[in-house]
Amino acid sequence: MPRRRRVLKRRPLEPDYQFSDLVISKFINMLMWNGKKTTATHIVYGAFEDLKTKGEDPLKVFRKAIDSVKPEIEVRSRRVGGANYQVPMDVRPERKLSLSCKWLIDAARARVGRSMQEKLSAELYEAAQGRGGAMRKREEVHKMAEANRAFAHFRW
């Protein structure tokens, strides 16, 4: 009887059917609630259509929004000598992508009124311009890291 739990292998992520892009597929999966992937897909593609009606290339706006929201540094709690310190650390590339997607989705959900499709397209557009709720969240995280720079020597 083995003592270790068996670790299940991760299923590979399928690219989305319209753009064949893994990042969009991950974004759709993160937007999805209660397993309703079709609804999440309609929301994302509808937001892309809204961006297209504004005269923008939706794929470029999406990529620019994701890249501009990605955090470079974040704080993590580290216990040293009975005290917890917020230690600034670099963010791994996979986590950068996850955090930027999460922040964009949360900022879109926090917007008031209208449909989720319109809120998401507005948030993507603003993030690509360097504005919006997701960019505020990124700046907040960077400010926290800057404020706790004195504890950077606790990195491991």
Question: Could you tell me what each predicted segment is?
Answer:
Residues P2-N34, T38, Y45-W156:
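Strongly charged
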